């Protein structure tokens, strides 16, 4: 969509029409060009901050903010930020903790690269649901490991599973969704709000982990993150449509219609 829209936006309409005809034929190309022109007309017309408070747009922006905050509040970053404490509680010494931290970084990198191939093959919605559901189950197991005082390799295996699940789903796909769900006329402002919300959520997650861990213990903390992932799964299932192979205009219409 970005290449196609870019051609229209830079007056390379013949190139855009050629691309669209190759995709879906003459009638499809004409419909898409008309839809794109209408979208750009809205984008270039005068808009104010009050447009963000239109009820239908507020629901879309609210969904975007939820997606951004959920990417952080799913809890995975506490594993990166507090890896020493987590592995220490699992019975590892200093050398073991350092090795495990290196392994978690490698797993994160590998499965981030995997996401490059799966985002268009599997779709955005299935990957977001896989990530939230997978983390929910993984946290339930990890919390149980701490509750029953299981230590060593089993805890490492569960932690690596959580990191792999996050790296190929919620971590990259959140940014893909946020770039696609907003109407052109408010996309810049809406993205700014979502990015701000994401970093605020990251800060809150980081500063609350230790107090929560003291109050609930390692098991209760990860069970709590599991409940948050359950809530995220339910909201994503109910509110987020599949955006794969859809134009930005189709996504906008679907979201405003459902909202």
Kindly label every feature range from the protein language model.
Residues 1-21, 34, 40-259:
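Alpha-helical transmembrane bundle of multi-pass membrane proteins
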Residues 22-32:
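Short intracellular "coupling" helices and adjacent cytoplasmic loop segments at the cytosolic face
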